[in-house]
Amino acid sequence: MDVDWASWLRRWEAQQAYYLPDREERFHVMIGLLREVVGSTPSVLDLGSGPGSLARRVVDSLPGARVFAIDADPLLLELGRQAVGDRGGSIRWVEADLRQDSWVELARTWGPVDAALSTTALHWLSPREQAGFFARLAGLIRPGGVFVNGDHLSFDQDQQRIGAAARALQEEEAGRDAAAHPAETWDEWWQAVESEPGLAALAAERRSRWGGHPDYHSPGEALAMQASLRQAGFTEVGTIWQHYENRVVVAIR
């Protein structure tokens, strides 16, 4: 049965923007940083790529870039393959679980890695899994290369009132934007996917594999992530952009 892949991708983008009104600004910062640190023709890993929201923007902004897009979700990967494509060989779609070692060997087939990017994905790894993940990642990125992560990262344990105020302001801002630009929620988008006959097999495979994503958001995760990156061997680590708890963390290898 035919699937309107382009329409599903547009709906995905709309529901993501529903939760992240400043999503495009965050993408802009990440891609600009990529260009400034490793140039305009980088070899990039997109870790937890989903349907390629970031990968597509990277190759559109930096036509000489090559992106190795890795995700464990079979439905979102197929959405990327069908709706985004390989952009003339610039994007390669790979199914692999970042919690396991197999993705590292697959990434090595892409050749030397200048940079790795991730958006709104690594909170699905526990702190222990993150530490192992960063150690493996440090072994892939060339010296002078960069890792850039965009995600919601909580304030520290001794900043609880600051964190609560930031979350309240962020929810208020997101509510205003959602009222001005109505869109499906995350749950509504997935419910619609489940009712699409042409996506039934992929949705069933996804359910059998995941059942539900774990969420390891916790107080202090921003500082904990930076400490794990330093321990893994990254030489410079810091936050380059922040809007409430929405941050871009950068680590130079």
State where each predicted segment sits.
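Class I SAM-dependent methyltransferase SAM/SAH-binding core
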Residues: L45, A55-S102
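Core SAM-dependent methyltransferase catalytic element
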Residues: T235-R253
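A short glycine-rich, Lys/Arg-flanked "PGG" loop and its adjoining helix->strand segment in the class I
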Residues: A131-P143
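Conserved class I S-adenosyl-L-methionine
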Residues: M1-V38, S53-R57, S102, V148-D177
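Class I SAM-dependent methyltransferase "Motif I" SAM/SAH-binding loop
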Residues: G48-G52
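Short alpha-helix
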Residues: H217-A232
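A conserved beta-strand element that flanks and buttresses the S-adenosyl-L-methionine
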Residues: L117
